Amino acid sequence: MSERAADDVRGEPRRAAGGAAAARQQQQQPQPLQPQRQHPPLRRPRAEDGGTGDTTTSAAAMATVGERRPLPSPEAMLGQSWNLWVEASKLPGKDGTELDESFKEFGKNREVMGLCREDMPIFGLCPAHDDFYLVVCNDCNQVVKPQAFQSHYERRHSSSSKPALAVPHTSVFSLLPSLSKSKGSGAGGSSRPPSGGVLCASSSSKLLRLPKEKLPLRGNMKPMHPVQQIKVPHGRVMTPSVKVEKMHPKMDGTLLKSTVGPACPATMSSAVKPGLNCPSIPKPTLPSPGQILNGKGLPAMPTLEKKSEDSSNNRKFLNKRLSEREFDPDIHCGVIDLDTKKPCTRSLTCKTHSLTQRRAVQGRRKRFDVLLAEHKNKAREKELIRHDSQQVPHPLRDPHPTPPRTPQEPQLPAESKPFLASKPKPQTPSLPRPPGCPAQQGGSTPIDPPPGQESPHPPLPATEPASRLSSEEGEGDDREESVEKLDCHYSGRHPQPASFCTFGSRQIGRGYYVFDSRWNRLRCALNLMVEKHLNAQLWKKIPPVPCTTSPVSARVPHRTNSVPTSQGGISYLAATTVSAPPVLLSSTCISPNSKSVPAHGTTLNAQPAGSGAMDPVCSVQSRQVSASSSPPSTPSGLSSVPSSPLSRKPQKWKPSKSIRPKESSALSTNCHNASSSTSGGSGKKRKNSSPLLVPSSSSSSSSSSSSSHSVNSFRKNCVAHSGTPYLSTAPSSHSIGLNCVTNKTHSVSLRHEQAGRGPAGVSSAEPIKRMSVMVNSSDSTLSLGPFIHQASELPVNPHSHTPLDKLIGKKRKCSPGSSTVGNSGSKPTKVAKLPAMNNVHMKHTGNISGAQGLTNNSLLHQPKARP
């Protein structure tokens, strides 16, 4: 032991024969615990490696095989096969067999140890460049990393005495299992203590010498002089001592304290988080020398310790052999294994058994698909939590310190500025995201990974277009099972070129480059056409809200034969508006001598006027309103617009019960009794795509058919009004309905009513019938309740608070005082009280104009029901 250690400290090259003899001599001596320093084959020795600084380990290793010569330059064999270069690079005078034999007889005593590929999770991808330290197991002389030591012992020597190693409280990080299932490499390997021959480990805040009574060894362990090695009986349990830090050249051995026990280096803490194999952890090793001198400057110690303990518990469970797990049908595959006759205890995402086999397993508390979805969601959540937690200790383990992020100009997605001369956007020198991260693909905007998740890769090229991101769908399924992930840095993305020629093109989309700007207009026009087409398809079902403030005559295709007169009706609408746009609920037929007959419905003006304040032109409009609004107290609980006599402000609309009178076809002949506005409608109800129109039927046959609609079909299209109906009050009598009584158009329209119906002396009950025609002929989706004004000479509705369930579907006779004034012989209307549909107004209880209410009402409730 002393010969090997002395040789290593002095750095003298050892020849193969002498090494073999020394190895045989060492086999007879008890093997003490020694830290193994991995010597890369082609690395030059450094002064801080200890000794005199003239150690030529790589030269010694190659000298045992043959004289070393420089490899031939690949440029000398330009265009030829790589095999020629391999042959030319072989050592002179030796063929492959001799090389193999010499290496075999050189055995375990060579200075540079060959590692097999299975050990890559332990030793990393590039042992030539990675600095790490090894420990030797006293039982089997296996060389393992400190992180892998505990799992190695549990796997190999758990039958023998368990390690009586208590983690000292002064050291922060306990020894954690490496998650590699692979074996360690060959047992040999050179071991040398650090300069001064002392073993060091860093503790939480300062380097502490452990008290002698706390040394966790069962054998009588004598603390030796610091310069000497601590001797341990061979039969004792492994006591790995770990050389933690690369020694700074100026540091003396006297600064180092010694400790025994499985105190892992604090710098390796983050490496063992969910295990060495977590892909986002680059390597479990030491940072640059200046970062942790004297063991200080280690941030976030307690949290790291907690995380490492949790991860060790989790990984112990995962590393359990499948046969040792207790079967749970809710979390395990459960398919009976033919060999062991036991249920499979892999997770629900078991790749060994098919989906049908896993679905056929009995005893699960839920269906297999539900459990599988929950399992995948949990795995994703764990992954997210793990990546969040790894953002904290990013100063540790960062072998290539990244340059500070350059201030980046604000980047817009390429879709928002498609035709600007956009070169490939410079991406900040950020690092690729670890493979566990969800792929963030934001069009062609480059992504910066979170600043904490720094990985050991060199920065990405600055001119890399971010449109080449790769997505990682489907990786979350077997993350939990992939225990054998490599402990080496690798990128989750395809390698990117540092720069590439764009050949004068401009990138205007994801992977979309344009060479000629002459086609920009055509491309833009095509894009707009495609967008318009898609939007038109979308808005066929959801009509857009018009934001105009004047009645749009071009968007009101009238459905009667009296187009000129109805255009006159629109001009009267424009005359009556003061502040709010009237909304055409249906086409209105107006006779040439200002006799208004609401043939298909009514035109509601959203602006209530003061009593007697309207001129005869406005009275035409107000007559039309009064056709539907003068009966205030029908049993359907119509609510009115409360307005003072002189107020011109838009009033507060409240939803209430809508009227749905069931009229006979005799009542619906009001549509046709005007002399100049006989409607020649088709009698069919067709869907109207104009958002301003509520489709109405134009003949008495369709109105009677729609009046035969069941209340249930109405219910389907309505939203029940949750509030209490708004009480119609007496001050609301000064609304437009009053004007229609005082103006001449009322009597004129009464004349037409007598001509069409026969009973004389029809008073304001006539507008009820007109109103019922309108409601019946519309598709039972429009609630006119909030927009119906009440006349002054009519009493307050006595039925406004009748409960909804009593009135739905019940036919009630109107009281003479409530529905007919001056015409008690008129035919009583059968009214079924129905819920109002404009539930949208429950949100707009403020002072909003009636036009908005009407617009919302007509928009949200386009008719779709068929008789």
Swiss-Prot record:
It comes from the Eukaryota. There is a cross-link at residue 243 (Glycyl lysine isopeptide (Lys-Gly) (interchain with G-Cter in SUMO2)). Residues 1-59, 379-483, 600-711, 845-867 are annotated as: Disordered. Coiled coil: none annotated. Residues 16-39, 619-647, 689-711 have a biased composition (Low complexity). Residues 665-674, 846-860 have a biased composition (Polar residues). There is a cross-link at residue 243 (Glycyl lysine isopeptide (Lys-Gly) (interchain with G-Cter in SUMO)). Residues 472-481 have a biased composition (Acidic residues). One of its GO terms (molecular function) is chromatin binding. Proteolytically cleaved by caspase-7 (CASP7). Acts as a component of the SAGA (aka STAGA) transcription coactivator-HAT complex. Mediates the interaction of SAGA complex with the CRX and is involved in CRX-dependent gene activation. Probably involved in tethering the deubiquitination module within the SAGA complex. Necessary for microtubule cytoskeleton stabilization. Involved in neurodegeneration. Component of the SAGA transcription coactivator-HAT complex, at least composed of SUPT3H, GCN5L2, TAF5L, TAF6L, SUPT7L, TADA3L, TAD1L, TAF10, TAF12, TRRAP, TAF9 and ATXN7. The STAGA core complex is associated with a subcomplex required for histone deubiquitination composed of ATXN7L3, ENY2 and USP22. Interacts with SORBS1, PSMC1 and CRX. Interacts with TRRAP, GCN5L2 and TAF10. Interacts with alpha tubulin. Belongs to the ataxin-7 family. This is Ataxin-7. It comes from Mus musculus (Mouse).
